[in-house]
Amino acid sequence: MIEKMIREARSQRASDIHISEGQAVYLRIDGKLIKSDLELSDEMTRKLILSLLTKERQESIWRGEDADFALETSDGNRQRVNVFCQQGRLAAAIRLLNAKVPTLSQLHLPPVLQNLANEPRGLILVTGPTGSGKSTTLAAMVDYINHTRADHILTIEDPIEYVYEQDQAVIHQREVGKDVCSFAGALRSALREDPDVILVGEMRDYETISAAVTAAETGHLVLSTLHTTGAANTVDRIIDVCPVQAQNQIRIQLAGVLKGVVTQCLVPLIDGGRIAATEVLTGTDAVLSQIREGKTHQLGSVMQSGAAAGMHTLDYDLAKLVSRGLIEKKTALKYAQDKRELEQCIF
């Protein structure tokens, strides 16, 4: 039943499936929730969701915890599944992933991301709201490294979303809750495992942030995600998560290791589907100086004048998509950070 449901959702270009006892099945298509034609009784829904869970995961659900895991179907595709309870009833959110990691060009991402992936060391962050494609962008960067240089790549994920086929690189993928207890613990262990590149699925807390920055300081290329919008907000968020007594130190450390921040959101195309609109901040001397001095409010101006270093604001990228006839102006205005800047950028 679940495989049939997933196949049908994929045929409709859905990105997510929502299943809940007592409710209809919903699909997210091009960012919008659409009611599915599939009808399930409460009993069928409950059995379907329970069939996805191991005994241990069922026990965690009854303890009031969520279950977050990957599901591979017979066609080789993977799905990220989150099962939870609401009002005493079971529910599941299923994110549909591709079996094959897309390339940076297939994702229509700017060439500067390839330049960032070529960095031998430092910290690269991909940020944006939930469902904005952060994990897919990181996977494309990791796979680019896999096909271009003989590095040892270590990923720490919760759960593992894409499984890489080794090419030039040696790749080890560790899953939180299965192979390791936590992101921070896995990062500390990683420094003894001779990696060149470390992918951290998400920097959720101070301990993980501190360990990731330390790994970048010690000569590794660290890639991770944050649920933030805008490059300046990302830097501020990292610092704000830290204890007050550690904030100045983390600011100095960031200024020493940050190579780039990529913020993205998925916007609807005129002809259907969605495309990533991006904001890119690269670790130039001017950027790192502003971070070191606590002047993150000036990073927007640096990005506006930093095209030669691959930088651009989200509003500039949205304006470019409008000018190319890919998205409507009203769509761009909906996602814009500064509507006046967007109007000025449309050409």
Where are these regions (language model features)?
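Short, flexible helix-loop junctions that flank or precede catalytic/ligand sites
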Residues: M1-F347
